[in-house]
Curated annotation (Swiss-Prot):
PROSITE patterns: RECA_2. Belongs to the RecA family. GO terms for cellular component: cytosol. It comes from Lactobacillus delbrueckii subsp. bulgaricus. It comes from the Bacteria. This is Protein RecA. Can catalyze the hydrolysis of ATP in the presence of single-stranded DNA, the ATP-dependent uptake of single-stranded DNA by duplex DNA, and the ATP-dependent hybridization of homologous single-stranded DNAs. It interacts with LexA causing its activation and leading to its autocatalytic cleavage. The keyword DNA damage applies. It holds the Pfam family RecA. Keywords: ATP-binding, Cytoplasm, DNA damage, DNA recombination, DNA repair, DNA-binding, Nucleotide-binding, SOS response.
Amino acid sequence: AYAEALGVDIDQLILSQPNTGEEGLQIADTLISSGAIDIVVVDSVAVLVPRAEIEGEMGDSHVGLQARLMSQALRKLSGTIAKTKTIAIFINQIREKVGVMFGN
């Protein structure tokens, strides 16, 4: 309803809520490679959690996993994006203070 009020044609909207970062980026790659879409928005990069982190134990160290996942994905996607002329938007969050929302 809100998207429609903003002018989004929801019949043309593809919404995906993947379980892992790898799954989400694979879906983006598949859609971009198909040439059937004009724009893909990943919201948010912060929740593209690597499979190893999801399957690991609480407290395990996963230093750099998300950075490596994004680096690899962007290297792979950049060529496909250029060929298909698809617009790709990646939204992320910056948190300076844990627990603070909306600039408070």
